[in-house]
């Protein structure tokens, strides 16, 4: 891995990983309507029992490639430290200082406007994801769709260079980030669906965990670069007019372009029988029919989509509001928040890769339930021992962060295992849609608990309550792995 990052012999990198993942056996198919079906013998998996490791790593590197959009642009740096700063409010109001109510109101308005922009993006994803997933499956060109979406994402992130530090440029920044959020989610639909091309039923958990883990590691490396540039004062470059943040955006765009390339070079296009492409209206009619069929024929699959929509929103809330809890409730400085972000991504990345093996041995449902249980417990401790000080957040916050990745990766693995062959992109489109449909839960409970109890720390329980609700719903989901553990590959 280091040879690739440091510009070493890429050929040696891929040759060293050419040893294949081997399918050693099959999971028993079950026809019980109350149990999620197994697809160990489904034609959606590779025809060969061997998947070249270079294809696995090429696929997983796409997670690494796109992570800076989430960690650097959306979460920790561009929006938090630049787009919602006083660079984008009226200079006369900015001159009043942070203690003036007008200044605070202007900053709050920026944050609110950004939130509305991302909310609009979420609504569009909910409307478009399942239909575009159907079209990708019908055309048999998931990789082509992924390539187009990746290039648009690169353009959106690179376009943030033109967001100068003036109020007039604010909505350009919001628009580019919102559009980037849309294409990133749609790209994920096709990326997740391609997982069956680079894994077998015995290795799917490890492959999914590898992707998530590399994603977190990519976030760490990107954040470290930002810290180093700031530490060395950009090596004397002019950083006025927001140039530092604008160059960070360009760097993230180049990062995505470079590290996404291996997937398109080494992972072949899926080989499925093409189906007729239908209109948008017909696509929604098919979606309704699919939901009805899931209710009648595979109700546990529908339960999983519902449960995962709830707890995944809670997991998203953990990272969305974690930095706010650290800064407001525990008094972390800006540098401490970024340091915690690096540590959280490191812990999450390592734990996700390790948890992938437990996914293959014990089944993704058990991994999900254990991870959610630990998250709920850690969140309660953060609130209960808040008075002890920052050490509580460091310990429990990192423990909590270490469980988010395993839960997310196991969820992706579980759905890929039970998706009908040739319709994986459609199912992941539905996965994205249900997730977006529940995306108001964590922010709403966060705000409600703070309003009711009058302190930011109580918002933690609001987010944790969403995770707990999803965990309870997950108890109604049954998979073949629940009948017995799978032997390790």
Question: Where is each model-derived feature located?
Answer:
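Multi-pass alpha-helical transporter architecture, strongest
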Residues: 255-266, 461-489
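Intracellular juxtamembrane helix-capping segments at the cytosolic ends
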Residues: 186-199, 406-419
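Glycine-rich segments within core transmembrane alpha-helices of 12-TM secondary carriers
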Residues: 209-230, 434-442
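A membrane-interface helix-boundary motif in multi-pass transporters
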Residues: 107, 230-253, 448-467
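Helix-to-loop junctions at the C-terminal end of transmembrane segments
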Residues: 127-141, 351-364
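Juxtamembrane intracellular "pre-TM" segments in multi-pass secondary transporters
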Residues: 39-56, 268-306
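Short amphipathic helix-loop junctions that connect adjacent transmembrane helices
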Residues: 73-109, 320-336
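Structural signature of the two symmetry-related core transmembrane helices
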Residues: 144-159, 366-381
């Amino acid at each position: 891995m280091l040879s690739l990052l440091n510009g070493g012999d890429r050929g040696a990198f891929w040759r060293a990983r050419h040893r294949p993942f081997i399918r050693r056996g099959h999971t028993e198919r079950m026809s019980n309507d109350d149990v999620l079906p197994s697809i160990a013998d489904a034609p959606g998996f590779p025809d060969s029992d061997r998947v070249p490791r270079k294809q696995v790593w090429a696929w997983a590197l796409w997670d690494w490639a796109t992570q800076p959009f989430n960690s650097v642009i959306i979460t920790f740096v561009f929006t938090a430290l630049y787009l919602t700063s006083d660079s984008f409010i009226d200079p006369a109001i900015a001159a009043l200082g942070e203690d003036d109510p007008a200044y605070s109101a202007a900053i709050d308005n920026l944050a609110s406007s950004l939130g509305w922009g991302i909310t609009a993006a979420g609504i569009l994803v909910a409307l478009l994801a399942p239909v575009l997933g159907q079209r990708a499956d019908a055309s048999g060109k998931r990789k082509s769709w992924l390539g187009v979406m990746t290039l648009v994402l690169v353009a959106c992130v690179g376009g943030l260079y033109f967001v100068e530090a003036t109020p007039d440029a604010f909505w350009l920044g919001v628009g580019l980030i919102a559009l980037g959020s849309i294409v990133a989610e749609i790209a994920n639909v096709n990326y997740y669906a391609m997982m069956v091309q680079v894994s077998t039923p015995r290795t799917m958990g490890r492959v999914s965990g590898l992707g998530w883990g590399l994603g977190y590691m990519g976030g760490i490396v990107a954040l470290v670069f930002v810290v180093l540039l700031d530490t060395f004062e950009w090596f004397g470059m002019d950083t006025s007019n927001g140039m530092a943040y604008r160059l960070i955006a360009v760097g993230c765009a180049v990062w995505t372009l470079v590290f996404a390339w291996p997937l398109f070079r080494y992972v072949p296009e899926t080989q499925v029988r093409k189906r007729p492409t239908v209109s948008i209206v017909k696509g929604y009619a098919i979606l309704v029919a699919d939901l009805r069929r899931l209710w009648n024929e595979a109700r546990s699959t529908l339960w999983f989509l519902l449960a995962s929509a709830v707890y995944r929103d809670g997991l998203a809330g953990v990272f969305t509001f974690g930095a706010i809890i650290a800064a407001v409730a525990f008094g972390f400085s800006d540098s401490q928040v970024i340091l915690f972000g690096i540590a959280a991504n490191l812990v999450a990345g390592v734990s996700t890769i390790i948890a992938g093996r437990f996914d293959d041995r014990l089944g993704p449902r058990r991994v999900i339930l254990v991870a959610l249980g630990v998250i709920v417990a850690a969140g309660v401790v953060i609130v209960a021992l808040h008075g002890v000080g920052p050490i509580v957040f460091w310990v429990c916050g990192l423990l909590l962060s270490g469980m988010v990745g395993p839960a997310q990766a196991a969820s992706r693995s579980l759905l890929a295992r039970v998706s009908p062959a040739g319709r994986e992109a459609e199912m992941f489109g539905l996965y994205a849609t249900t997730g977006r449909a529940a995306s108001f839960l964590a922010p709403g409970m966060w705000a409600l608990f703070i309003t009711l109890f009058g302190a930011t720390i109580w918002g933690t329980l609001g987010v944790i309550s969403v995770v707990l609700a999803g965990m309870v719903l997950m108890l109604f989901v049954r998979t073949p792995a629940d009948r017995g553990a799978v032997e390790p590959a």
